[in-house]
Amino acid sequence: MGLKTAVKMTGIVKKFPGVVANDHVNLEIMAGEVHALLGENGAGKSTLSNILTGLYRQDAGTVELSGKKVEFNSPRDALNAGIGMVHQHFRLVSTFTVAENVVLGESDSSLFMDQKAVAARVQELSDRYGLAVDPSARI
């Protein structure tokens, strides 16, 4: 049996004065999956997340949880439906280099890893895929 849809956002539109933050965005997350919303600053990631968690109301579109349409008027509504969000704060974690960020989630990484080897591997991958990445840049 296939995975069931846990979250489905269809045709989500959210506008702010002078800005269309989300323009008919669709997102479907299956039960048991983990997703990451990636994009440049201003791409609408936080706005979409804020709609899902009840901080904002969408101007158009629908949100479904487990196949049932929901309308959140507040974060409390979303929490009651099992949806919550831990907000990122820019000072929660110190800045790391590109190389340190790449290995951050590795189970065998530690403070004692070979920083030069990690930076060299990141540079190698950057070169292979034509990316202009400086492994020592702090981000």
Show which residues each predicted segment covers:
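Glycine-rich phosphate-binding loops of nucleotide-dependent enzymes
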Residues: 1-139
